[in-house]
Amino acid sequence: MMEKIRKGDEIVVITGKDKGKRGTVLRRVDDEHVLVEGVNRAKKHVKPNPVKGVAGGIVDKDMPIHISNVALFNPATKKADRVGFKALDDGRKVRVFKSNGELVNA
């Protein structure tokens, strides 16, 4: 199945506490959530683990964000944009921006 938002895409948060922030998708957590670099950060308390060499303390961590709260960044318009799909003549299915019809770079 074709995904509208993939790993490596540059996105804009369109709603929530981080509205307007831009970041890169690190991975898809599941069908409905993505992990975005520098967005939706939370403080997590980590226990020290001398065996693994981990020092304890409070760590900032990226948390998953729902896919409905993000939109793909369109470099041509410099704004967040919706994504659609288009079948090419050679049979490939590609992602396109809804506003201007340009192909999304893979």
Curated annotation (Swiss-Prot):
The keyword Ribonucleoprotein applies. The keyword RNA-binding applies. Gene3D superfamilies: 2.30.30.30. SMART domains: KOW. Keywords: Ribonucleoprotein, Ribosomal protein, RNA-binding, rRNA-binding. Coiled coil: none annotated. InterPro entries: KOW (IPR005824), Rib_uL2_dom2 (IPR014722), Ribosomal_uL24 (IPR003256), Ribosomal_uL24_CS (IPR005825), Ribosomal_uL24_KOW (IPR041988), Translation_prot_SH3-like_sf (IPR008991). GO terms for molecular function: rRNA binding; structural constituent of ribosome. GO terms for biological process: translation. GO terms for cellular component: ribonucleoprotein complex; ribosome. It comes from the Bacteria. Belongs to the universal ribosomal protein uL24 family. Part of the 50S ribosomal subunit. One of two assembly initiator proteins, it binds directly to the 5'-end of the 23S rRNA, where it nucleates assembly of the 50S subunit. This is Large ribosomal subunit protein uL24. It comes from Dechloromonas aromatica (strain RCB). The lineage of its organism: Bacteria, Pseudomonadati, Pseudomonadota, Betaproteobacteria, Rhodocyclales. The gene is rplX.
